[in-house]
Amino acid sequence: MEIGLGVFSGECLPSEGKTHTQVLADSLDQMRLAEAVGLDAIWITEHHFLSSGYVGSVLPYAAAAAQATSRIRIGVSVALAPLHDPVRLAEDAAFVDVLSGGRHDLGIALGYRDVEYAGFQTSRAERVGRLEELVAVLRQAWGNGPLHHEGRYFRRVGMEVFPKPAQAGGPPLLMGGHAPAALARAARLGDAFIMDGGTDSSVFGSAGHNRDLYGRVAGTLAMYREALAAQGRPTDDVRFYLTLGGFLHDDGPDAAWEALQEAYLYTRRVYGDWYGIPEETWGRWYPHLLTPEEHAQRRSEVALGAPEDLLPVMRRLRAIVGDGLHVMFRCKYPGIEDGVTRRSIELLGEVRRALG
């Protein structure tokens, strides 16, 4: 199995007392550290129109990551596919792949925030069709010869994208989502599926409790394999990506939660708003406002501790999925002091080495 480090959102909070330039420079240093300690990938994500500076320019950020590193894979999880022009995305992703020497993985999904669709003058009702046509254009653009795509949303005929990606056929296309339709789409069009293991996930609902991670992974994997079989695709040795939030600390789970909780609850408030959870619910997600029971619920959403605490979690997940599992472990959160995050990354490297 593999472990990647996520997510690099490029956010800069006032509490950090730094410029955005400094925060981004720190993030590139953290990517170098992830490579040095033996992690398999770093993951960059996309959203728009947030005062925190959440990164919208996801491929330029990936290009900077490619130049800052030499071995680790450079992943995007995820680009909001319906908001992108397919030829522009094909060119940018191919360029990152060439720049990195064939280390790029491109994750895509539909997106869901109305403000982002409005900002790009795109109808949310068209998002599935736009994503599917975008995939068709990407596949053509990364092959040989000129494009010939005449669809409902895009007409791209006669031009050819250069340079071609370093990886034959282009970067692996990973597809994320929550609904059964997303699994079916990934099996039909993608190279792998990205499952949201819990952090920032709508599966929490208003209760916020991470319900049966292992059962959900097993169930989602089974549905993905069924969808692959329906497409006549292999179901053994499946590549399966799982996002999982948490934090590592030398002193164990309590210390890890103490380091993480302010930043994590900030992130949960943001996503609670995005997912349409009532403000009277997520508006209370501050450490000083939560009841002891609510604290326990929030804490249950993430994997916490020293390496010896995380290893059983990773081994159990590997036993369910197999060696094709890639865990995108999120211990990179806005607002946590750089040195504290760096130590968490170092400890995550210990977990990766222990897994072999």
Please state what every model-predicted region is:
Residues 1-356:
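Active-site-adjacent structural elements that line small-molecule/cofactor binding pockets in enzymes
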